[in-house]
C-alpha cells in the first residue's frame, strides 16, 4: 500500500501564487502578512524580487476566481492561495459573494489540476475577522501551511 502526504521540508522548491482581495484590506493585509511570514520561515523567497511568490490584488473576493484562473494560465504554479475577507452585513450580498467565490475557486482549481487554498475569511463581525487575522491567531499562517502541504503533495503525486 502506498501512502502519500505533503511535506513541509521541501517548501523552498515551490512556486506560489497569491490572489488577494483589497476589500476589507485592514483584514486582508494582516492575513497576507501571516501568509508571507509562514512561507518565508519555510524557505521560500518572499522578497520583492522573488521568482517564487507572486501576488495579485483584486477589488474583492468575488473577483478571486478569475484572477486565479488568469494567473495560473500565465505561469506555472504549484499552488495558489486565494485570500479575502467577507463580513456579513444587513443584506444578502454576503451570501452571494461567498457562494460564488467558493464555487469559482473550486472550479478553477479542478479545471487546472492545481490546488487553490480557500483563504477567504467569512465572519459575522469585524471583531471576529480581526481575531482571525492576528489578534488571537493569524489564519494567513494556516493558509500558507495548507499551500505548502498541498503543493508538495501534488508534486509528489505527479
Curated annotation (Swiss-Prot):
One Pfam short name: DMRL_synthase
GO biological process, any: riboflavin biosynthetic process
GO molecular function term, any single one: 6,7-dimethyl-8-ribityllumazine synthase activity
Reactions accelerated catalytically: (2S)-2-hydroxy-3-oxobutyl phosphate + 5-amino-6-(D-ribitylamino)uracil = 6,7-dimethyl-8-(1-D-ribityl)lumazine + phosphate + 2 H2O + H(+)
EC number: 2.5.1.78
Pathways involved: Cofactor biosynthesis; riboflavin biosynthesis; riboflavin from 2-hydroxy-3-oxobutyl phosphate and 5-amino-6-(D-ribitylamino)uracil: step 1/2
InterPro entries: LS (IPR034964), LS/RS (IPR002180), LS/RS_sf (IPR036467)
CDD domains reported in the protein's UniProt record: Lumazine_synthase-I (cd09209)
Residues annotated as catalytic: 93
S-S bridge residues: none
Binding site for (2S)-2-hydroxy-3-oxobutyl phosphate: 90-91, 132
Its biological purpose: Catalyzes the formation of 6,7-dimethyl-8-ribityllumazine by condensation of 5-amino-6-(D-ribitylamino)uracil with 3,4-dihydroxy-2-butanone 4-phosphate. This is the penultimate step in the biosynthesis of riboflavin.
The protein's name: 6,7-dimethyl-8-ribityllumazine synthase
Species whose genome carries this gene: Prochlorococcus marinus (strain MIT 9301)
Gene for this chain: ribH
